[in-house]
Structures are given as C-alpha cells and as structure tokens.
Design a protein with these regions (language model features):
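Bacterial Sec-dependent N-terminal signal peptides
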Residues: 1-22
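Short, small/polar-rich motifs associated with maturation and membrane association
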Residues: 19-146
Length: 146
C-alpha cells in the first residue's frame, strides 16, 4: 500500500510541475523567446511591439511559437544598438545542468521540444532538474517580472 501511495505522490508532483502557468505572457524578439514583463521592464530598448491574441492570428514567421501563444504572443522589435541582451539556447541550458542537450525543457509548464530555441537570460527565474517520464529534465520558472 505504501508503494502505491508513494507512486501516486511522485506522479502527481510531476504532473503539477508540468502545468502551464496562465499568468505568463511570452514575447519573441529576433527569434529569441522572452516575456512581456521582461520587455516592459526594459521599455527603453523596445522600438515597437505587436500583440497577437491567438495562435491562429500569428504570422508565418511566428507559427513555430504557436504552442506558447495560449495567452497571446507579443512580437517585439528592439532598437538598433540594443540587441545585446544575454541569451542562451535550451541545448546550452540543458548542458549546464547535466542534461542531454536534445532533451525538451519546460518553461512555466510549456514544453519546448526544440532545444535549439533561444531564450533571453533576463526571463530566467528558478531552474530545477526533475525526473520527468524517467528522464532528467530542466524546469524553468520565469523571473518575478512575467
């Protein structure tokens, strides 16, 4: 009976950690993922932004990000000379935490399957490595400015 209880607790904790966070709103600039809150905190570098309310309204260049457009997706254009924000690919992030580079990464419950995807370092909050479906997987929460 204890084994069944422990198994249930482990499975439920993994399921809860993989739930999508409805409060996070993603933004993309120069094919790099960030958050709307991150860019709002750096308004001086933003030239313009365009908000798409649903994945169906995304232009062709942003269709590959439709999986993170549950709450809409914002396309940000950064002013010339301000493109130097820290960035990291998910493969590099996996490598830093001892996880195989091609392993998907979870960001606020959204599964990023393509590990060549780049994210801005400013969006990163807590990073945890957890067991997910029998494999070590990186789980990332965004910084307090969502």
């Amino acid at each position: 009976m204890k084994k069944i209880l422990y198994s249930f607790l482990i499975l439920s904790s993994v399921a809860l950690s993989a739930q999508k966070n409805p409060s996070v709103k993603f933004a993309v600039a120069n094919d790099i993922v960030g958050t709307v809150g991150m860019f709002n905190a750096k308004k001086n570098i933003v030239q313009s932004s365009n908000v798409y309310k649903s994945s169906a309204s995304l232009p062709q260049g942003l269709k590959k990000y439709s999986f993170i457009a549950d709450n809409g997706l914002t396309e940000v254009k950064i002013k010339n000379g301000f493109e130097g924000l820290d960035r990291v690919s998910l493969a590099e992030l996996n490598s830093q935490y001892g996880v195989p580079e091609n392993t998907p990464v979870f960001i606020e419950g959204y599964e990023f399957i393509d590990s060549s995807t780049k994210i801005y370092g400013d969006m990163m909050g807590n990073v945890d490595v957890k067991d997910y479906n029998g494999k070590k997987t990186v789980f990332l929460s965004t910084s307090a400015i969502k």
